[in-house]
Amino acid sequence: MEIACIILIIGIAGADLAGKRYIEGHFQKNQTKDLAGGKLQLRKVHNKGLAFNQLDAKPDLVKNLSFTGTIAAFLYELWLFRKPGNGMGKLGLALMSGGAVSNTFDRIKRGYVVDYIGFPFKKEKLARITYNIGDFAIFIGAILMCIGNFDKRK
């Protein structure tokens, strides 16, 4: 299980960084391209803060929080690997770690996170939200960790 989780972390981070590199090289800032019949959009957005641009006026704090959170996730993962069972929790944490590595790398190297996946919702506030593969991995990983911890307590 541990090897699979390590491969997953590298795969998520690698896929997300490749997507970010493509977007940075081929899109202008705020440029949008419709995909899947207009149900999905590729766009180039620079996020200097945390989720939804929180703390974007404090880039050093954001970098430090991101770096600390990524290290904490890895340490927790090492601790979790030593314990038998809870495969769902381990998988969830691996997804979260892969996304965290990619976004933290962006914050340290670029000073912002490249987001590039959007959905054309009718409500403008929702339509402006832009994600990346790492964000989805963190979200899905958090759900899997909760399920893994819930199942463990039965």
Regions found by a protein language model. Name each.
Residues 1-154:
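Alpha-helical transmembrane bundles and membrane-interface segments of multipass inner-membrane proteins
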